[in-house]
């Protein structure tokens, strides 16, 4: 195992938000990715929690600042601050509860109302280990994600299936959009100080990256 770099030693800082109904497993996805932990007794998040983890992309260190909030309506007052500066999002539903998938459309609208048009979004069908209880067909979710220009994966925070891949794919896509902008001369991400909000460009930038294809459960 290589030596750890200092926590503040990174090339880019990206803010990602986790959104979706209460009980879909957002907090466990966060803890699985950042600490490799899963809690059966996981309780609803009160207010906002955030954690960080750094990953390597093309020999750069990307530090992800991951924000998680409760899905219950009574916490909606934090909306604006929660979304501010986000360049990526995991929109999570529970494959065993169709209502959580139906509500994805509302969460997506809220996300797009409060973020830049180019935010990189991964639709995540969590609890994929509970195949015998599936209520949301994979194809239904995949079709929706394609219509809405999102990436898509099914995950299990319990057994860690696709958790790493979902987060790192979003981070990689954000980085590639930025890198293309720098090469095109339309932006210079290298000049951004650490922690500054990153503008990932116009809609075409993200669409071009997404057209290369992605993921499935």
Swiss-Prot record:
Keyword GTP-binding carried by entry: yes
Binding site for GTP: 20-27, 68-72, 126-129, 156-157
Localization per record: Cell membrane
Motif Effector region, residue numbers: 42-50
Pfam families named in the record: Ras
UniProt entry keywords in alphabetical sequence: Cell membrane, GTP-binding, Lipoprotein, Membrane, Nucleotide-binding, Prenylation, Protein transport, Transport
Membrane-protein topology: Lipid-anchor
InterPro entries: P-loop_NTPase, Rab_GTPases_membrane_traffic, Small_GTP-bd, Small_GTPase
Molecular function via GO: GTP binding; GTPase activity
GO cellular component terms given for this protein: cytosol; plasma membrane
Residues linked to a lipid group, S-geranylgeranyl cysteine type: 214-215
GO biological process, one term: protein transport
Predominant subcellular localization, coarse grouping: membrane
Chain's role: Intracellular vesicle trafficking and protein transport.
Family indicated by similarity: Belongs to the small GTPase superfamily. Rab family.
Protein's name according to its UniProt entry: Ras-related protein RABA1e
Organism: Arabidopsis thaliana (Mouse-ear cress)
């Amino acid at each position: 195992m290589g030596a750890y770099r200092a926590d503040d030693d990174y090339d880019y800082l990206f803010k990602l938000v986790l959104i979706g109904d209460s009980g879909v497993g957002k907090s466990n996805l966060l803890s699985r990715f950042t600490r490799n932990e899963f809690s059966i007794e996981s309780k609803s998040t009160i207010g906002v929690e955030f954690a960080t983890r750094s990953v390597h992309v093309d020999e750069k260190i990307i530090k992800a600042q991951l924000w998680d909030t409760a899905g219950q309506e009574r916490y909606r007052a934090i909306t604006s601050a929660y979304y501010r500066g986000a360049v990526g999002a995991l929109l999570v539903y529970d494959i065993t509860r169709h209502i959580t998938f139906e509500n994805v459309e509302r969460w997506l609208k809220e996300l797009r109302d409060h973020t830049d048009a180019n935010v990189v979004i991964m639709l995540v069908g969590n609890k994929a280990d509970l195949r015998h209880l599936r209520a949301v067909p994979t194809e239904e979710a995949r079709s929706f994600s394609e219509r809405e220009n999102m990436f898509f994966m099914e995950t299990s925070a319990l057994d860690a299936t696709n958790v790493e891949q979902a987060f790192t794919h979003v981070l990689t896509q954000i980085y590639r959009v930025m890198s293309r902008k720098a090469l095109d001369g339309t932006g210079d991400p290298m000049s951004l100080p650490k922690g500054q909000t990153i503008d990932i460009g116009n809609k075409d930038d993200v669409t071009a990256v997404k057209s290369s294809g992605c993921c499935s459960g």
